[in-house]
């Protein structure tokens, strides 16, 4: 399959998983080797790898590593022997539903009692990885079709190759729109506190030769007020059955600003991110990370000594603020009734 992106976040080596350490970007390109499920779970928790699809893919490979270790320790009852490793993977990040989807899919392989379990598990993990890339390219096409030539777009966080199996979700739409119709401007907000927009999205777009302008998150409404943005395009970590969408903190504020200024708001997510067992956004668990991530920037404290911090890293955008949900199976523009459910089950 031809590539239109120059970056990959995961590389399966057959006996271990290599992860591009996204905490070190863009200053350093460092790969971390994961030789066990524990290594993989720690990398997910510590945000070496991030982005819902990439987390799911990494977890799938983590199951392969868990199975290999369990078979070496207790070949007669290896499925039971890997239970602790699977629990550790499952608890690594609470909001990204792709993690649980991938682990459930790998568990189905274990439960099927294949003749060659390791080969079957590895094939399943590779399929999850490859299917994600295929889905991203399809979403790129579907989303780009909705964006007129010469439009200005703004994206939030990082939803590109670094967050997925390749190409990206929201950033995949931007890649497709740029190469197909052309865009007047591509803006990325910095995305505090981990600066995924400044560090990762800008890095990906520059590497691909797509001009990008960085803005502070608080500048987004002014950008809309001045008519420079026609679409805000974001990814998702979990989409509820009613269309409510959990994504990186700050997404909800962008959606409210879009509604105030008549700017279109697009969510781009593979079907693996849709949780039909979750009826609405109020049921989505919101991860809160250590306050130090707000109080410090790298190794330097930026907040006054004695100040505390509240650090939720996701918020929920109600479906009524979303103009379109793009998946590899099609698009949803009407979230009433069975809109999302019909797309997935149809």
Curated annotation (Swiss-Prot):
GO terms for biological process: L-methionine salvage from methylthioadenosine. InterPro entries: IF-2B-related, IF-M1Pi, IF_2B-like_C, Initiation_fac_2B_a/b/d, M1Pi_N, NagB/RpiA_transferase-like. It comes from Alkalilimnicola ehrlichii (strain ATCC BAA-1101 / DSM 17681 / MLHE-1). Substrate binds at residues 50-52, 93, 196, 247-248. The keyword Metal-binding does not apply. The record marks 157 as: Transition state stabilizer. NCBIfam families: eIF-2B_rel, PRK05720.1, salvage_mtnA. The active site is at residue 237. Its EC number is 5.3.1.23. The keyword Transport does not apply. The lineage of its organism: Bacteria, Pseudomonadati, Pseudomonadota, Gammaproteobacteria, Chromatiales. This is Methylthioribose-1-phosphate isomerase. Belongs to the eIF-2B alpha/beta/delta subunits family. MtnA subfamily. Gene3D superfamilies: translation initiation factor eif-2b, domain 1 (1.20.120.420), Translation initiation factor eif-2b, domain 2 (3.40.50.10470). Keywords: Amino-acid biosynthesis, Isomerase, Methionine biosynthesis. It is an enzyme of class 5 (isomerase). Catalyzes the interconversion of methylthioribose-1-phosphate (MTR-1-P) into methylthioribulose-1-phosphate (MTRu-1-P). One of its GO terms (molecular function) is S-methyl-5-thioribose-1-phosphate isomerase activity. Pathway: Amino-acid biosynthesis; L-methionine biosynthesis via salvage pathway; L-methionine from S-methyl-5-thio-alpha-D-ribose 1-phosphate: step 1/6. It catalyses: 5-(methylsulfanyl)-alpha-D-ribose 1-phosphate = 5-(methylsulfanyl)-D-ribulose 1-phosphate.
